[in-house]
UniProtKB/Swiss-Prot annotation:
<keyword id="KW-0812">Transmembrane</keyword>
<dbReference type="InterPro" id="IPR003961">
    <property type="entry name" value="FN3_dom"/>
</dbReference>
<dbReference type="InterPro" id="IPR049625">
    <property type="entry name" value="Glyco_transf_61_cat"/>
</dbReference>
<feature type="topological domain" description="Lumenal">
    <location>
        <begin position="26"/>
        <end position="577"/>
    </location>
</feature>
<feature type="glycosylation site" description="N-linked (GlcNAc...) asparagine">
    <location>
        <position position="98"/>
    </location>
</feature>
<feature type="transmembrane region" description="Helical; Signal-anchor for type II membrane protein">
    <location>
        <begin position="5"/>
        <end position="25"/>
    </location>
</feature>
<feature type="domain" description="Fibronectin type-III">
    <location>
        <begin position="481"/>
        <end position="577"/>
    </location>
</feature>
<dbReference type="InterPro" id="IPR013783">
    <property type="entry name" value="Ig-like_fold"/>
</dbReference>
<feature type="glycosylation site" description="N-linked (GlcNAc...) asparagine">
    <location>
        <position position="275"/>
    </location>
</feature>
<dbReference type="GO" id="GO:0005783">
    <property type="term" value="C:endoplasmic reticulum"/>
</dbReference>
<comment type="function">
    <text>O-linked mannose beta-1,4-N-acetylglucosaminyltransferase that transfers UDP-N-acetyl-D-glucosamine to the 4-position of the mannose to generate N-acetyl-D-glucosamine-beta-1,4-O-D-mannosylprotein. Involved in the biosynthesis of the phosphorylated O-mannosyl trisaccharide (N-acetylgalactosamine-beta-3-N-acetylglucosamine-beta-4-(phosphate-6-)mannose), a carbohydrate structure present in alpha-dystroglycan (DAG1), which is required for binding laminin G-like domain-containing extracellular proteins with high affinity.</text>
</comment>
<feature type="glycosylation site" description="N-linked (GlcNAc...) asparagine">
    <location>
        <position position="540"/>
    </location>
</feature>
<dbReference type="InterPro" id="IPR007657">
    <property type="entry name" value="Glycosyltransferase_61"/>
</dbReference>
<keyword id="KW-0256">Endoplasmic reticulum</keyword>
<keyword id="KW-0808">Transferase</keyword>
<keyword id="KW-0472">Membrane</keyword>
<feature type="glycosylation site" description="N-linked (GlcNAc...) asparagine">
    <location>
        <position position="335"/>
    </location>
</feature>
Amino acid sequence: MNIAAVFNALLVSVLATVLWKYIKLREHAFMVEEELVLMRQSQELSQVQIDYHAALQTLLEDGTRMVCTGRMHTDRICRFESLCYSTEAEEFIYFHSNSSVMLPNLGSRRFQPALLDLSSVEDHNTQYFNFVELPAAALKFMPKPVFVPDVALIANRFNPDNLMHVFHDDLLPIYYTMQQFTDLDPETRLFFMEGWSEGVHFDLYKLLSNKQPLLREQLKTLGRLLCFTKSYVGLSKITTWYQYGFVQPQGPKANILVSGNEIRQFTKFMMQKLNVSLEESSSEEYIVVFSRTINRLILNEAELILALAQEFQMKTITVSLEEHSFSDIVRLISNASMLVSMHGAQLVMSLFLPRGATVVELFPYAINPEHYTPYKTLATLPGMDLQYIAWQNTAREDTVTYPDRPWDQGGIAHLDKAEQERIIKSTEVPRHLCCRNPEWLFRAYQDTKVDIPSLIHVIRQTVKSKPGPKKKWSGSLYPGKVRDARCQASVQGTSEARLSVSWQVPWNLKYLKVREVKYEVWIQEQGENTYMPYILSHQNHTFSENIKPFTIYLVWIRCIFNKNLLGPFADVLLCST
């Protein structure tokens, strides 16, 4: 064999080995560099350090893990580990591995209609959340993930340009969702996935966390595939008190679960974040008139302010969202004796009023106050301790309408002439569904000259003296069960019997200041469907009416504080005559 050929073959083999090692080293260096870039992207999200290789290995081996609370999509909140999001497909991804957990495991029921609601507005088809499923092995063929090391709360804002929606649908539910799960502390990062821009009230969302909230559009700048190491998806609806009329005309929710106490805990938190202190405020009592500057105007606002000041002998000031900072408005409202405003989103600020203050809501012509009650419902929540008054303009001549404006500002020029005539002549907007009823919009955006004597008369029916806040909490505490309930029967002949029942007061009564204590007793003959109810003032009573000899009776007893605070029934007594 030619020695030169052997030498060349060896040289080629050595060069190939060196070249292969160089390529492998370069690939490894490229992968390390890519991991460093992805790690830096992850750390741009947070100061939390992350071991990128370990995080990627965990995702490949363990996949996604999900455990949810709630039985239905309308009350479900889910906790995820390693939930991912494709910014290109704009969809969440659940990666399956042998270690994945999915509870509840709904199968195709997950699409009927969704796993959960992303917002606190119940069962709205623009607010549904779901994910796409992939095997964890698919990660090898996908863009390298950027890991989000912060604990994430993922939700939708419903309408961030409207202050009522901001507080009712977003801020309160986010605040109490974070109270519900200990992982959701002030270092949680909020991710809003509905697609809106920041909006005029975005600074309020920033108060809920020490970290800047991120919007869906911003996620595209972070990477093509984001993976949340730990996240919670969905919002608690427990603080919401109003439904907006998507299925039936708007009104209070059927089962309201929030009280004024929880609202006031939230407002206390917000005031602290806004650096608003009641101690900084003047002790002088005053009335606040909320001024609107674009639509739904009070045409004789100056006259109204003067009349209120004279009637109640109190300083009267105006505030507006356009001319005052939010913290200044909160500072003024939080110490006011009365808040007067046209119907509108700004009235949600009444949740900052002190206990004992008065809310006066003004309604334009043809708008029935009983049909639009978000602020009445708020003011009358148990424990809010606010007085609510509604006034409606009933004089057609005191209203200014704008039929030629665009439809979304109350214009009706796009409607046929007959419909325009009907709306103009109508004296009351019929109950309707949300959100584009032209008659409602026409009346909602009209301006009003307030009949001041009429308004003062309506206020005076509720506010008999000078209005003023009360600082002390007058909580509604419920009685416990009555104790040691006993019964004793006596029979007189074959046709008459008596049933003597006695009990001890609930043990918590001795710690409470209660104006009035009553007891409710139900007596039911065994086997019958009806019962005889009694309201009693004492802890014992002998019953003879409708009591029969040689009969078994079931007796229930409960305590009532102040006429309407009903305690639980004690265990049923079985009494034989």
